[in-house]
């Protein structure tokens, strides 16, 4: 069986590489034509795709998947409509491929510049959410990349049904149908092959739980665009406007719990802790959020707040639990974030411009926010259209990864007969 999985993955890889050579030179109009044809195919096959999703849902229930996983797995008519709108948004995005920047003459008379080009073949590994299949496929096509999609086994029927519509759209436009391929086996060995096929795959993008991303990071022989977790902070500084701080800290924690840009630790300046903490604690109590606090937090709010341990400062709860710490000022807040955080998204609430700029400069995260919720750390909210993932690494892409994150640059040299002396 291992040999057959290996042969299957080698075939998928070769087909993706061949398709990428065609896609890399496809015009914007041709790529948009393919995406529009995919839109039509999805519309025409909505009933079949939703029926396939129901098969996955029934299997999920019989396998006793938890309610959060089932929620991510489900494709409702409203979510399907949202998928289609996301595809429209990608069609409307400016195509970065072929853009030439930094063009300048050298003393020798040659012109030097940079041209934006596709990465080649993207391998994506993700869990549960079938809409990611379409988001990733559309971004790959628009950016001129072939993509190999390995979704979770719990969403296999949904992903296959969406992939059929994508293939149909590619055929209509005359682009290779293997530009987008869904791995049609639930065998975990397929992941091991995908992340080591350096001859076929140029970058791996894992989206899912920490254990999945750690495995991919440790075993991959290919560059990985990833974030391990989202331990995000909001620091309410002494000069914060509390009319802003209350809704920001409530939204950052309770808007959605199971997402990587939700706040997990609240830091409050000691100068305003006595005033601010009782108000926000009351709002959290209404939402049934469990608080785990430092000794000063517990002194102010009482014993209903559980004692925070060292582990709490490192924890991404993905649920209605929040760690709270009172700090002496901005220096302690920044030190805490840089020590315990995951370099994802961290925010300050303050009316002091100098301290806001200091926070922006010193916090080592992929997104740093002033006077707004951490929940804005998202490709759509940043104007990127859909996103293929979020990166907390510093090489290549950082933060939400949209079209430009799926591209690279090559040097171009324009001459008129010059030779090196």
Curated annotation (Swiss-Prot):
Keyword Glycosyltransferase listed: no
Domain of life where this protein originates: Bacteria
Enzyme kind, highest EC tier: oxidoreductase
EC number, as in UniProt: 1.2.1.41
A Gene Ontology cellular-component term: cytoplasm
Pathway annotation from the record: Amino-acid biosynthesis; L-proline biosynthesis; L-glutamate 5-semialdehyde from L-glutamate: step 2/2
Catalytically driven reaction(s): L-glutamate 5-semialdehyde + phosphate + NADP(+) = L-glutamyl 5-phosphate + NADPH + H(+)
Molecular-function annotations in GO: glutamate-5-semialdehyde dehydrogenase activity; NADP binding
Entry keyword annotation includes Nuclease: no
InterPro entries reported for this sequence: Ald_DH/histidinol_DH, Ald_DH_C, Ald_DH_N, Aldehyde_DH_dom, G-glutamylP_reductase_CS, Glu-5-SA_DH, GPR_dom
Cellular location(s): Cytoplasm
Biological processes annotated in GO: L-proline biosynthetic process
Keywords, alphabetical: Amino-acid biosynthesis, Cytoplasm, NADP, Oxidoreductase, Proline biosynthesis
Signal sequence interval, chain numbering: none
UniProt-listed Pfam families: Aldedh
Functional summary from the UniProt entry: Catalyzes the NADPH-dependent reduction of L-glutamate 5-phosphate into L-glutamate 5-semialdehyde and phosphate. The product spontaneously undergoes cyclization to form 1-pyrroline-5-carboxylate.
Homology family: Belongs to the gamma-glutamyl phosphate reductase family.
Protein name: Gamma-glutamyl phosphate reductase
Organism name: Acinetobacter baumannii (strain AYE)
């Amino acid at each position: 069986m291992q040999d057959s999985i290996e042969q299957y993955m080698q075939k998928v890889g070769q087909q993706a590489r061949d398709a990428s050579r065609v896609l890399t030179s496809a015009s914007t109009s041709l790529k948009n034509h393919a995406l529009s044809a995919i839109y039509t195919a999805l519309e025409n096959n909505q009933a079949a795709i939703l029926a396939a999703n129901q098969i996955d849902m029934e299997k999920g229930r019989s396998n006793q998947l938890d309610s959060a996983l089932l929620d991510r797995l489900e494709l409702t008519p409203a979510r399907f409509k949202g998928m289609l709108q996301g595809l429209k948004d990608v069609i409307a995005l400016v195509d970065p491929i072929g853009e030439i920047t930094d063009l300048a003459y050298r003393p020798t008379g040659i012109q030097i510049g940079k041209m934006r080009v596709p990465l080649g073949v993207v391998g994506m590994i993700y869990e549960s959410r079938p809409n990611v299949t379409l988001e990733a496929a559309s971004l790959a096509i628009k950016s001129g990349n072939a993509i190999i999609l390995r979704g979770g086994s719990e969403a296999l029927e949904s992903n296959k049904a969406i992939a059929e519509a994508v293939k149909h759209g590619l055929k209509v436009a005359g682009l290779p149908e293997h530009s987008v391929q869904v791995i049609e086996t639930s065998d975990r060995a397929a992941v091991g092959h995908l992340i080591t096929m350096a001859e076929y795959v140029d970058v791996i993008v894992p989206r899912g739980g920490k254990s999945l991303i750690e495995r991919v990071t440790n075993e991959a022989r290919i560059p990985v665009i990833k974030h391990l977790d989202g331990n995000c902070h909001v620091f309410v500084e002494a000069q914060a406007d509390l009319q802003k701080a209350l809704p920001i800290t409530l939204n950052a924690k309770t808007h959605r719990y199971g997402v990587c840009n939700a706040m997990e630790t609240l830091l409050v300046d000691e100068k305003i802790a006595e005033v601010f903490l009782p108000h926000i604690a009351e709002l959290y109590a209404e939402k049934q959020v469990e608080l785990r606090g430092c000794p000063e937090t517990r002194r102010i709010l009482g014993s209903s707040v559980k004692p925070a341990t060292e582990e709490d400062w490192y924890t991404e709860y993905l649920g209605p639990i929040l760690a709270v710490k009172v700090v002496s000022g901005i220096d302690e807040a920044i030190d805490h974030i840089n020590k315990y955080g995951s370099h994802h998204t961290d925010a300050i609430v303050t009316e002091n411009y100098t301290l806001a700029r200091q926070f922006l400069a010193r916090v080592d995260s992929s997104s740093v926010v002033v006077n707004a919720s951490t929940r804005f750390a998202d490709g759509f909210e940043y104007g990127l259209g859909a996103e293929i993932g979020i990166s907390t690494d510093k090489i290549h892409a950082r933060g939400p990864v949209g079209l430009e994150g799926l591209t690279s640059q090559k040097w171009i040299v324009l001459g008129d007969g010059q030779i090196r002396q």
